A protein has these predicted regions:
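Conserved PLP-binding catalytic core of the aspartate aminotransferase-like
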Residues: 294-324
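Conserved PLP-anchoring active-site segment centered on the Schiff-base-forming lysine
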Residues: 89-102
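Active-site C-terminal subdomain of aminotransferase-like
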Residues: 23, 194-284
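N-terminal "arm"/small-domain region of PLP-dependent enzymes with the aminotransferase-like
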Residues: 1-42
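Conserved active-site segment immediately N-terminal to the catalytic lysine
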Residues: 183-194, 204
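Conserved N-terminal alpha-helix of the aminotransferase class I/II PLP-enzyme fold
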Residues: 32, 36-84, 101, 105-109
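PLP-dependent enzyme catalytic core of the Aspartate aminotransferase-like
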Residues: 14, 338, 342-372
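Active-site phosphate-binding strand-loop segment of PLP-dependent enzymes
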Residues: 125-177, 188
């Protein structure tokens, strides 16, 4: 027997709520095939290099960067940047905050490096936060601005009492373009563009301090063997020429530039941060008011404005709820696969309309009231 359908008047105008790859505005996708598009042209020639230059300039404006900070980019995504930071930025030992799957992955990359001492790991259970603290023999401190697997947001600031020469690296993959941050006290704010920045994956970008660039120059010119793809100093050199070491996906660059420009046109990071705080707030209030749902992150101060995780009462099969939502065209509200909880996870990235989030809560109410 066919399942009853969510009434069409309840459905969101755009049903994509995944935490990555995220919703890309339809007009941006359409622009890829318009006359004059750079698609199918050389990434070494001015039209594409102008796109790269625009991305670097727009990110500089979006984050109001100090004049001596630089934006670098390259192929491979944030996962590659973990390895790049391991070989190009950490001299002897790092300290990491681990409070979810993605913070754990960078810590594991550091652990595997045969030329580094084991990292000092500050760890919290999923849904909680642990930031690295000063350690005497550590030269690099690392954590994530937003832990995508759990929906925990962390501060972006230099830890107290660390050595003046230590670097601070912050993974911003699900925060960049949606959560405000001050770059002036940290050294690398790195990310992939497939979330708030509404592009595709496979590219990394990093906002770098002069200290990070100097460290990369020194480490990569030392006796340590560094593959070209993991040589941050080489990536910086190419970025200064508005290029990447090897051929990038042009569509990714075009969509990223369009989103950066759109965010600036809307009001910049202040507008984006206000919008994501509002849309996530809609979901957190809904989860608190519904007797069958609870925000997974107990501390309101740690609740992410861009990745909302909601526990579902044991009387409801969350996997079945997600499947029924998908059957009705509502996409990608499943939880992070390795967390293993009876929950849903919903993106409230900057491209997601507040009205669509309101509609989603109505659809979830309907599904909960009409569950089998």
């Amino acid at each position: 027997m066919a399942q009853p359908r969510i009434p069409r008047d309840l459905l969101p105008s755009d049903p994509r709520f995944g935490c990555g790859p995220s919703r890309i505005r339809r007009e941006v996708v359409a622009s890829l095939s318009e006359p004059g598009s750079v698609m199918g042209t050389s990434h070494r020639q001015p039209p594409v290099r102008h796109v790269v230059a625009a991305i670097r300039e727009e990110l500089t404006e979006l984050y109001n960067l100090p004049t001596d900070y630089e934006v670098a980019l390259g192929n491979g995504g944030a996962t590659l940047f973990w390895d790049m930071a391991t070989v190009s930025l950490v001299e002897k030992r790092a300290a990491t905050g681990v409070y979810g799957e993605f913070t754990r992955k960078f810590s594991s990359a550091l652990q595997r490096a045969p030329f580094l001492a084991d990292p000092a790991v500050f760890q919290a259970e999923p849904g909680e936060l642990a930031l690295p603290e000063a350690v005497s023999d550590v030269d690099t401190y690392a954590w994530a601005h937003n832990e995508t697997s759990t929906g925990v947001v962390a501060p972006v600031r230099r830890p107290n009492d660390i050595d003046d020469n230590s670097l601070v690296l912050v993974d911003a993959t699900s925060a960049a373009g949606g959560v405000a941050a001050d770059m002036s006290t940290i050294d690398a704010y790195y990310f992939s563009p497939q979330k708030n920045l509404s592009s595709d994956g496979g590219l990394w970008l990093a906002i770098l301090s002069p200290a990070a660039i100097e460290r990369s120059n020194r480490v990569t010119s030392s006796a340590r063997w560094v593959p070209q793809m993991l040589d941050l100093s080489l990536a910086v050199t190419n970025s200064r020429a508005d290029q990447t070491l090897n051929t990038p996906a042009l569509a990714t660059l075009v969509m990223l530039e369009a989103q950066c420009r759109w965010l600036l046109d809307q009001g910049g990071m202040a507008w984006a941060a206000s919008r994501t705080a509002s849309t996530s707030g809609t979901l957190y209030r809904w989860a608190e008011d519904n007797p069958l749902t609870t925000p997974f992150v107990a501390d309101p101060a740690l609740r992410s404005p861009v990745v909302v995780t909601i526990d579902i009462d044991e009387s409801v099969d969350a996997a079945r709820l997600c499947a029924r939502a998908r059957d009705n065209g509502i996409l990608d509200i499943e939880p992070y696969r390795k967390l293993g909880r009876n929950q849903i996870r919903i993106a409230t990235f900057s491209s997601i309309e507040p009205s669509d989030v309101e509609a989603l809560t109505a659809c979830l109410d309907w599904l909960l009231e009409n569950r089998d």
